Amino acid sequence: MSSSEEVSWISWFCGLRGNEFFCEVDEDYINDKFNLTGLNEQVPHYRQALDMILDLEPDDDLDDNPNQSDLVEQASEILYGLIHARYILTNRGIGQMLEKFQAGDFGHCPRVYCECQPMLPLGLSDVPGEAMVKLYCPRCMDVYTPKSSRHHHTDGAYFGTGFPHMVFMVHPEYRPKRPASQFVPRLYGFKIHPLAYQIQQQAAANFKAPLRSLSYNNGKR
């Protein structure tokens, strides 16, 4: 960066509206080529994108070609997301995400009996472009769509399918107990038997069958 007052690309990206789920990946992690194995085959303009993430001087061609610059910017976001998915499986990355988890930065479970349990981001696919990020509740162990629409366009592959499970494998002390209570449907104060709905549906089906037959016979007269 040309000025000491300017923030790094990583800080800028993580500070964007809608990117609140991301943590700042350590530059030392990115500079270790081993951690980036295979990403050059997944991301177009890989070299230029990596330079942008690390705040290295861009090629002169980018300054002369605005369209190319936009493509590299898009590639940088994809590359950072894929690096992020790997980084948050490391001890340092897990530590950063746990801080956000404890602060409730990822939101809280909407299920009443989970009692506002903080959630963790989860991808339903590790392939970019297949599914947007979801939120995993470790108490009811179910998955939810983020409450805010600004997170509905964040790719789930940037967090990965195994992140929450890795967190609780490494730090089992953060895993909450399963909820002791479960909602029980009642009518006039009495519990509704699980088979009640099935019996009602069957009764309704049996009631409609004679009516259809009667209507058919009336139509032939």
Curated annotation (Swiss-Prot):
One of its GO terms (cellular component) is cytoplasm. It comes from the Eukaryota. SUPFAM superfamilies: Casein kinase II beta subunit. The modification Phosphoserine is found at residue 2. GO terms for biological process: Wnt signaling pathway. Keywords: Phosphoprotein, Wnt signaling pathway. It holds the Pfam family CK_II_beta. Tetramer of two alpha and two beta subunits. Belongs to the casein kinase 2 subunit beta family. PANTHER family: CASEIN KINASE II SUBUNIT BETA. This is Casein kinase II subunit beta. It comes from Spodoptera frugiperda.
